[in-house]
Amino acid sequence: MDHVPALVLAGCCFLALLPGWACGLGSMSSIAVSYGEDGPVFCGLNSDGSHLVACFGADASVLYGAPPNIPFLGLTAGDGFVCGLLLDTRQPYCWGSNSYVKSGVPQPMVEGARYSELSAGDNHLCALRAAQDGGRGSSAATSLIDCWGYNMTATHAVDEAVSTVSAGSVFNCGLFARNRTVFCWGDETVSGVVGLAPRDLHFQSIGAGGYHVCGVLENAQVFCWGRSLEMQQVVPSSAIGDGDVNIVPMDAMSTVVGGRFHACGIRSLDHQVACWGFTLHNSTSPPKGLKMYALVAGDYFTCGVPAETSLMPRCWGNSGPLALPMAVPPGICVPTACSHGYYEYVNHGEVGSIKVCKPANSRLCLPCSTGCPEGLYESSPCNATADRVCQFDCLKCVTDECLSFCLSQKRTKSRKLMAFQMRIFVAEIVFAVVLVLSVSVTTCLYVRHKLRHCQCSNRELRLAKSTAYSFRKDNMKIQPDMEDLKIRRAQEFSYEELEQATGGFSEDSQVGKGSFSCVFKGILRDGTVVAVKRAIKASDVKKSSKEFHNELDLLSRLNHAHLLNLLGYCEDGSERLLVYEFMAHGSLYQHLHGKDPNLKKRLNWARRVTIAVQAARGIEYLHGYACPPVIHRDIKSSNILIDEDHNARVADFGLSILGPADSGTPLSELPAGTLGYLDPEYYRLHYLTTKSDVYSFGVVLLEILSGRKAIDMQFEEGNIVEWAVPLIKAGDIFAILDPVLSPPSDLEALKKIASVACKCVRMRGKDRPSMDKVTTALEHALALLMGSPCIEQPILPTEVVLGSSRMHKVSQMSSNHSCSENELADGEDQGIGYRAPSWITFPSVTSSQRRKSSASEADIVGRRATDGRNVGSSIGDGLRSLEEEIAPASPQENLYLQHNF
């Protein structure tokens, strides 16, 4: 452990008890920004008080590395990485691509150590230990600070109590708790921050930048020191604007943050932003007239949380994200009451007051504003629940704004008076109406009483009875038919709500684009991350509306673990939008054929086959369990999405249609689909059956095995079917395997999958297997790939079974077709198994052994090659023998009815 004198050490960021919420290059707050060559990323805690983190930006390592279910107290960030202080253990946890700050809990880590603050520089992280017993934490006389990263990995001891720390690029500075003086340590070769630190000034807070430090003094003035003029050594002078970071504004500030060569602060008077220092010529200016709650600085850009109910951050500068479709809290929740000079923040939204801190004993404290601008007076002082309120002094108006406000106040008073008079007038009218009605009712009752004594003729009585009967009959007709009312699962959103969630459908939030629609990432007001599919406005509005309602109707009916879940929709004029669950890992196409080669390598054989099994289960549900069956018509790798747990979901039902109750009966439909995946029989003869989806899925299986696109003209044989099928039939399985991955030690599983793919892409639809048999064969192959015989393979530990208490016993029935002796032996070994219905489970690798056998499609069960060709190799024999291993996958009909009705 290093023992550092009081003037040579570091620290972090100021918490809720310090003035304002600000975050320099890497100080801790509820928001943080990473930067670097892979692009900027904005991360923030959710505004719902869950303490979960959400990120938005360009760096994939930070976006996909963010833990979705781990709560954090606060965040900090540096060059290509983000760190957070874990809410439960109070230890740091990092993610990203920085080579000096590794992902996970930094090591070495003192056992049992707990920390109160974090601070990140360009390539290092420092943490201030919390005061605790046992000698592992800070005390009233000594503070311990642990650092990790480039030239920083060490534990430092300070002879006094340290209240806050803040990290720059290659140095750190902190404040002593006793006298609020500053001390610094680290590499000052470029900045000179350590030697220039003012030892006789007292600060409320500090914010370290790249090569300088700025702080808010006790009189709310800003003081900066350092050598940011040396930036010309890093950035070409032709790209730099004018300004010196040491020339600070004279306004009183509540918070200050530091970027690479600039600084920004929030003015105490009006909570607006002021920035100074060097900027790049193409930088955007800070927002004018917009109040801010909190700030965070990257290298050449700054972001802030505006004082609006939406709490959607804004950024300015260079290279940073401009619009962020996410809501974040303006600070960190603390378990103590707000001290003097602070008030508890509550978000007053459209639906009422929303407390951003969930625990009842925690709160978010913001600093009170000081004073009022010229021409205004303080009508309400700052208290524990609200900031001070300033109003115009109508007796001393000198500006047009003041005159307009005072005139509106007079009009408001006049309207209130008129409203009061109107209420009196309405009350008088109501009294008169009630009086007239009372007299009328009294008169009617009197006349009716007199008429009772009159004798009516028989004709009049019959007429009265006939009228009464007709009235009762008409009443019966107008009763609503309650059976016609339908309950939809999909929620209806307003266009404004979805536009706000996606940042105005900006290009930054666009995650995909097709021929007929664009997909945007958005965050709803409750913090839910969604994908919004927006239809491209077409000239044929009627056709576009038909496809929209078709997909909406289908997804509202369907419910399966491996079909994309529809959350809601919006139909506003010509705008048609569908809201889905957001799939964090994109599509299978992006992994197999995207520009990032690392995505393809991460998709190992086990994960690829698992995705194939899960997609097959989804299509099997459409064909076998939906009533009536659904034909997708656009099965392809770009329509198989992957969620954050790497589970597959079948998506895009815009071209889907309802099939006949008998899945073998063809429909006469014009061809629709994607080139390379389209069934040749459907294309030529216009015969559409569920086997058309089987052909498309066979192409996807070939993509998974080979890593090649369905149609890739850079190869001599551009069509994947024409290239792969002859090689598979010849037994040359190595020739089609993706060269990016090493082949498994046992190729039997991949041989089975290749054989299934060949059968799926047969020219005649009746020669192809059904999806239940394809699913069974793929599950056999997955069991082999995982290292156990498919008959004895248990359910994988990672398999998630929903409603497992509803598992059913299914007896194995022998096939009506002739089988070999080995097949008979296999049938005896299987015995009785258990399987949850497919519409409530994720796929099981052993479910194929537990399905009821079927003899409806003899081409797969027990079928032998009849063309007389003999490959002569053991590989060819192994591929042909797979035909005997594919069995039907559908459960019994009574099980389906039992679980659905």
Curated annotation (Swiss-Prot):
Coarse class of the protein's main subcellular location: membrane
Pfam family, one: RCC1_2
Sequence repeat spans: 33-68, 72-107, 125-160, 162-195, 203-236, 253-287, 292-330
Xref: InterPro entries: Kinase-like_dom_sf (IPR011009), Prot_kinase_dom (IPR000719), Protein_kinase_ATP_BS (IPR017441), RCC1/BLIP-II (IPR009091), Ser-Thr/Tyr_kinase_cat_dom (IPR001245), Ser/Thr_kinase_AS (IPR008271), TNFR/NGFR_Cys_rich_reg (IPR001368)
Membrane topology (Extracellular): 25-423
Disordered: annotated span: 845-876
GO cellular component: cell surface; endocytic vesicle; multivesicular body membrane; plasma membrane
Annotated binding of ATP, by residue: V511, G512, K513, G514, S515, F516, S517, C518, V519, K533
Subcellular location: Cell membrane; Endosome, Multivesicular body membrane
Glycan-bearing residues: N151, N179, N282, N383
Membrane-spanning segments: 424-444
Source superkingdom: Eukaryota
Keyword line: ATP-binding, Cell membrane, Developmental protein, Disulfide bond, Endosome, Glycoprotein, Kinase, Membrane, Nucleotide-binding, Receptor, Repeat, Serine/threonine-protein kinase, Signal, Transferase, Transmembrane, Transmembrane helix
Annotated GO biological process: embryo development ending in seed dormancy; flower morphogenesis; lateral root formation; positive regulation of DNA endoreduplication; regulation of asymmetric cell division; root cap development; sepal giant cell differentiation
Active site: D634
Stretch forming the signal peptide: 1-24
Paired cysteines (S-S): C338-C365, C368-C382, C372-C390
Enzyme Commission no: 2.7.11.1
Region 7 X 36 AA repeats, residue ranges: 33-330
Repeat (TNFR-Cys) residue spans along the chain: 357-391
Residue numbers on the Cytoplasmic membrane side: 445-901
Subunit structure, as described in the record: Homodimer.
PANTHER family for the chain: SERINE/THREONINE-PROTEIN KINASE-LIKE PROTEIN ACR4, SERINE_THREONINE-PROTEIN KINASE-LIKE PROTEIN ACR4
Function of the molecule: Putative receptor protein kinase. Could play a role in a differentiation signal. The CRINKLY4 (CR4) mutation affects leaf epidermis differentiation such that cell size and morphology are altered, and surface functions are compromised, allowing graft-like fusions between organs.
Protein name, as recorded: Putative receptor protein kinase CRINKLY4
Taxonomic placement: Eukaryota, Viridiplantae, Streptophyta, Embryophyta, Tracheophyta
Encoding gene per record: CR4
